[in-house]
């Protein structure tokens, strides 16, 4: 066992002495040491219940013959951090989480690892760490929130509240209606109830083979979630005994499986960033072009909020993630021989899964679209690619040619949109919000929700080198690479320029002459921004482009 390095032999008497002070007995020194990375925190609704949840995991580990060691991990609530300077810290927190989990695991030579995340950056951050340390790992998240309902019974969620803000500014709803939505949208603990970033990542963990069936869809308040915690605690001890490590499960083919599921279920566009980052940590090269290749052959089988009225509880009742995977396997779209934490292949694991509601999960014969819910666009405006959640775009605006209205920050954009600078037919451009330029690649949920709330969702497109919340819907193209701060062409767009967005043909073009394009690029000098935070200055210096997963470069030059 790895942990023998800190507990065996005469030289380790001081180490054992310290461990005895933690409550260990003599018999514990012959057992596997299992780390539990717990992201319990009081200010994130997806995490408020994780303290008790971790106790279930710990007890199951003890019963299975392991010694559990729980440690804490930070977290940021993207919804609460949204629309102000707090969002600068959201994506950077992913790197802090990865570094901190790696630090604890390696410093204490743990034999196995249970990850207990739930919300946006915490899930990928923990998985990135697991890819680095490469020990037996199982992820068991806290589960989704139940959908809310207005007084008249309409299903709602957090995205509804953001859009209601735009609605009240436009005069489409009154304050009483806003209060009704606000007070009913988030009724329980858990990760926000649609196919937003947190739930997307927790679902993808099933396709990666590192989570148990039901991890993505069983509600936080469902008694089955506690059973999942017990099973995870027992199973991690078996994984350690079997020596089945993270990279034994996750390889190039597994990442392809995850992207295939992601595209079929209409996952958040943020998942592209996170899966690319996880790939990097696992030593896997995964170009953006490969994602588009998968998207072109993968049908959209599922549309949950914000793309429809369905929520995670509906997906769970319809058969969950395994039902989607089983359907995809019928078209030979998956690598079925990849192992999982169940110690059986993904093909064996999904063998008995079935769709129980074809309104929520459509069969292959009746997909929402023949191609995928995520699309990667290329063109002179995004030579290294851009990402759009095509499943959440109104069909009327899948192809859009419009005039640019340019903003150099999210705050400028919100002010401009609410003050009427954006008209029907415009293409809103928000730049200097990329990984370096933000810094931190803020989510543009407030501008997009304002556009939707004002009734412009099928009349206006938005392009940014920032990113979007999983709750975003509409023609919102993010992750434009290279970003403006790195000298990308998005930095040369001027008010009134014509832009073509063609999602079916994967194009994004600035419609100016080649000579004018070259002249502007030659003269372009990216704006420099004052960054008061020492941490964010370091982040801005070392972070890479969105098409590389916005990971931190380990080159110190």
From Swiss-Prot:
Annotated binding of Mg(2+), by residue: 78, 120-121, 443
MF term (GO), any: magnesium ion binding
GO cellular component terms, A-Z: cytosol
UniProt xrefs under SUPFAM superfamilies: IlvD/EDD N-terminal domain-like, LeuD/IlvD-like
TM stretches of this protein: none
Subunit-structure text: Homodimer.
Family label: Belongs to the IlvD/Edd family.
Protein's UniProt name: Dihydroxy-acid dehydratase
Organism name: Sulfurihydrogenibium sp. (strain YO3AOP1)
